[in-house]
């Protein structure tokens, strides 16, 4: 692999993952019904709107699911996969389109589980360090984490003032990640 190919591969992977992360965060903001007037939410919306606007007319959001975000995330993941395949010389041995869509869905699910993991870690650290803070980032993390945590809190309520539900969520995230690795 030449230096130019390696640089191009690095850029495709990292810039593609950054864009995919912003799109996934936009979907998580919508699903959690986070405050869209939060400055960080506004930044994510302004960055992702040019990509999502063409799909909005065809795929409107229904309830907590933003279909335009889901389709765009899978498309970006497929473009990343095709770019990597093209760079490493696998231009002519690409799988059929349904397999590519499957890989795209698995990639997006993997990213969302990783984002959920990091949101949960951030939520735990914030609860120790800055429990009462009103910083926009902290508020956004709380708003994203609460809908994810609430079903686990119902299964495992506080015991003596200590919340053990994140442990159950960590176990669930790990099970999902193992399943995605073997899909």
What are these regions (language model features)?
Residues 1-183:
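Selective transmembrane helix interface/packing segments
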